[in-house]
């Protein structure tokens, strides 16, 4: 069963009232990256390929900082820090505005115990301009029955509280 948006909002930081939806919380764009070097996934580990940010531009019609993205595959980083509570699992879905503009956002399962500022795989099929801070995805939380919580290499990603540092 999915939790209500107000419950999800308690596990997202920062969050504005207009991000809270009936069944989840909208996530916003922090950065868009392009992978520039190959990665590798082995049986005993992984290497994430080098990435570089898509260069933002100042929008002459507003105070927003925007990026114009050409067709291709990118990494979209979210601005919010997410904490998935025990006995829950997180799912991130694209907002319909992305799909209506020939774009798609993919995400892996967000395990209980994960804390961090995550990212998604962003497919662009037609040029689009996106403002930093634009709402592009929705996080929902479902109840889950599991024995352990997340303790992997992405714990506390892109936050100031990485263990052991």
UniProtKB/Swiss-Prot annotation:
Keywords assigned: Hydrolase, Nucleotide metabolism
Keyword Isomerase: no
GO-annotated biological processes: dUMP biosynthetic process; dUTP biosynthetic process
Molecular-function annotations in GO: dCTP deaminase activity; dUTP diphosphatase activity
EC number assigned by the record: 3.6.1.23
Broadest EC class assigned to this enzyme: hydrolase
Comp. bias regions, Basic and acidic residues: 39-49
Pfam families from the UniProt entry: DCD
Coiled-coil annotated spans: none
Described purpose of this protein according to its UniProt entry: This enzyme is involved in nucleotide metabolism: it produces dUMP, the immediate precursor of thymidine nucleotides and it decreases the intracellular concentration of dUTP so that uracil cannot be incorporated into DNA.
Protein name from the UniProt record: Probable deoxyuridine 5'-triphosphate nucleotidohydrolase
Organism of provenance: Halobacterium salinarum (strain ATCC 700922 / JCM 11081 / NRC-1)
């Amino acid at each position: 069963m999915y939790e209500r948006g107000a419950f999800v909002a308690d596990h997202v930081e920062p969050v504005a009232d207009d991000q809270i939806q009936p069944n989840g919380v909208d996530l916003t764009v922090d950065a868009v990256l392009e992978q520039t070097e190959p990665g590798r996934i082995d049986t005993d580990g992984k290497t994430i390929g080098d990435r570089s940010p898509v260069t933002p531009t100042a929008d002459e019609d507003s105070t927003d900082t925007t990026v114009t993205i050409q067709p291709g595959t990118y990494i979209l980083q979210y601005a919010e820090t997410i904490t998935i509570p025990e006995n829950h699992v997180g799912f991130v879905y694209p907002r319909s505005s992305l799909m209506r503009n020939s774009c798609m956002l993919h995400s892996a399962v967000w395990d209980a115990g994960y804390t961090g500022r995550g990212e998604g795989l962003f497919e662009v099929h037609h040029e689009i301009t996106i403002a930093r801070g634009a709402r592009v995805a929705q996080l929902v939380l479902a109840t889950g029955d599991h024995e352990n919580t997340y303790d992997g290499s992405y714990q506390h990603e892109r936050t100031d509280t990485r263990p052991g540092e």
